A protein has these predicted regions:
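N-terminal beta1-alpha1-beta2 module of alpha/beta enzyme domains
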Residues: 1-68, 73, 168-170, 347, ...
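Internal, glycine-rich beta/alpha segment that forms the wall or movable "lid"
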Residues: 85-191, 203-219, 223-225
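Hydrophobic faces of well-ordered beta-strands that scaffold small-molecule active sites
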Residues: 3-7, 41-43, 74-76, 104-108, ...
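Active-site mouth loops of central-metabolism enzymes
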Residues: 9-23, 79-87, 168-178, 234-237, ...
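Conserved, mostly hydrophobic/aromatic
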Residues: 3, 37, 45, 65, ...
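Glycine-rich, proline-tolerant flexible connector loops at the mouths of alpha/beta enzymes
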Residues: 40-61, 80, 112, 198-200, ...
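An alpha-helical appendage that flanks or caps ligand/catalytic pockets
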Residues: 5, 125-161, 203-326, 359-365
Length: 365
C-alpha cells in the first residue's frame, strides 16, 4: 500500500485567510511528504464556495509545489475538465510537468454542481460525455499531435501545444464517487481511479474494483495496469481517545462547511433519505436535524471510513483495503484548521505508512 497526501480545506473570507499563511500547511506538509517517501500530493479544483475554496486551480498550486519538492508526484484530484478548454489543460499541465521534471498527473472529473458551470453553462447536462471527449483530446495534445481549431479570423488552423511535457504519455486518472460504470469506463481507457467512501462502503468498493480489474484485462491491458486510490480523512496519533477528542469537533465543522454546497443544490436535488426518513432539503433547513446528520456522519467515518486513530487501529482499515485491491490511500489531512496539530499528526501517519510501505518514493522520471 502506498500513501499520499490530499488537501481540500475550507477557507473563509477573513483577514487571516487573505495572507500567504493560508497555504503554509500545504507547502510544509508537501515538503514533509516529499522527504519521507509518500507517493503524491493531491489538490482539488473548487469554485465559488469556501469549502475547498483555497484551490480554484490545481495546476497553479502544483506548479508552486514543483518548486519545493523533488520526488513526490504532483496530482490534481481533480481537473473538472468540462469547465476548461482542452488546449489550456494540456498547456498548463505541461508547464507543471516541465517544472517538476516529469511528476505531473491529474484525474479528470465531470463535475457535479451547476454553479461551477458558469464558465460553460451549455456543457452541464452532457458533462460526462464532454469529459470523455476531452480525455482523448488532451491525451493527443500531450503526445504531440496537432488538432484543428478555428482562429479569430474564422479560419481553420492546426495547432500543437507548448511547452512539450517531460513525460511522453500522460498518466491518466478518472475520479469516481462510487459510480460503477465510471470505474468500468476508466478501465476501458487503462486509466487509474481516484475514489472515496462518500457514496459507497468497503464492501461495495470491493465489487467495483473486481469489475474494474476484469474490464482492464478484457480491454487488453496487462496485469498490474491501473491503480485504485481511495481518499480518506486522516489523523493518526498515539492514543485513541485523545485522537477522538482532537478530531471530532473540527471534523464535524468541516463536514458542516460542505453542507453549504448541499443547501444550494437541495432545491434541484432528488430527495434523499436522511436518518429518520426525511428528505434532504427538509433536513438541511432544520439545524437540529442537520446536526444529527453530522453526528451520524462522524460516527460512520470514525468507525469504518477514515484513518482516524492510532497506527494499530488504522492498520486494520489499511489491511482490509489492501485485501480488496486498493493500491494507495490519499490522506486528506487538512480538515483540522490548526497547523501544529496537523503537522504533528503527520508523524503518526508516517509510522502507519512505514508498516505498509517502508520504501522511499521513486526519484522523478
Amino acid at each position: 500500500m502506498e500513501f499520499s497526501l490530499f488537501f481540500f480545506s475550507s477557507c473563509f473570507d477573513s483577514q487571516d485567510d487573505r495572507s500567504s499563511n493560508s497555504y503554509r500547511l500545504l507547502l510544509d506538509a508537501a515538503k514533509f511528504a516529499d522527504e519521507r517517501g509518500f507517493r503524491a500530493v493531491w489538490t482539488p479544483e473548487r469554485h465559488f464556495n469556501p469549502f475547498g475554496g483555497l484551490f480554484p486551480n490545481p495546476s497553479v498550486v502544483s506548479a508552486a509545489l514543483a518548486m519545493i519538492t523533488s520526488r513526490i508526484r504532483l496530482r490534481a484530484g481533480s481537473v473538472v475538465s468540462p469547465l476548461h478548454h482542452p488546449i489550456r489543460i494540456a498547456e498548463e499541465w505541461a508547464v507543471v510537468d516541465r517544472l517538476s521534471g516529469g511528476r505531473a498527473e491529474f484525474a479528470f472529473a465531470s463535475g457535479w454542481h451547476s454553479d461551477d458551470f458558469v464558465f460553460y453553462p451549455e456543457r452541464y447536462e452532457d458533462r460526462s460525455a464532454h469529459m470523455y471527449e476531452q480525455i482523448a483530446q488532451v491525451q493527443a495534445l500531450w503526445a504531440g499531435q496537432s488538432r484543428k481549431a478555428t482562429n479569430g479570423a474564422g479560419r481553420e488552423i492546426e495547432i500543437r501545444t507548448y511547452p512539450r511535457p517531460v513525460q511522453n504519455r500522460l498518466p491518466l486518472w478518472i475520479t469516481s464517487n462510487g459510480n460503477a460504470e465510471t470505474m468500468k469506463s476508466a478501465a476501458r481507457l487503462g486509466a487509474s481511479v481516484l475514489t472515496n467512501f462518500i457514496g459507497q462502503d468497503a464492501e461495495e468498493l470491493a465489487g467495483k474494483i473486481a469489475d474494474y480489474r476484469e474490464t482492464l484485462e478484457s480491454s487488453g491491458f496487462p496485469r498490474g495496469a491501473g491503480r485504485i486510490a481511495v481518499m480518506l480523512h486522516t489523523f493518526v496519533g498515539d492514543d485513541l481517545e485523545r485522537v477522538r477528542r482532537i478530531v471530532k469537533a473540527p471534523f464535524i465543522d468541516y463536514l458542516a462547511s460542505s453542507l453549504t454546497l448541499l443547501r444550494k443544490l437541495a432545491p434541484n436535488a432528488t430527495p434523499g433519505a436522511a436518518p429518520g426518513g426525511i428528505g434532504l432539503e427538509e433536513a438541511l433547513r432544520d439545524p437540529a436535524v442537520a446536526r444529527k446528520l453530522l453526528d451520524f456522519a462522524f460516527a460512520r467515518y470514525w468507525q469504518s471510513a477514515a484513518l482516524l486513530g492510532t497506527p494499530d487501529s488504522c492498520g486494520e482499515l489499511v489491511r482490509s483495503l489492501e485485501e480488496i485491491g486498493v493500491d494507495e490511500i490519499a490522506c486528506l489531512i487538512d480538515f483540522h484548521d490548526d497547523y501544529e496539530t496537523v503537522m504533528g499528526g503527520l508523524e503518526g501517519l508516517l509510522r502507519l505508512k512505514e508498516r505498509f510501505d517502508p520504501s522511499p518514493a521513486p526519484a522523478a522520471r
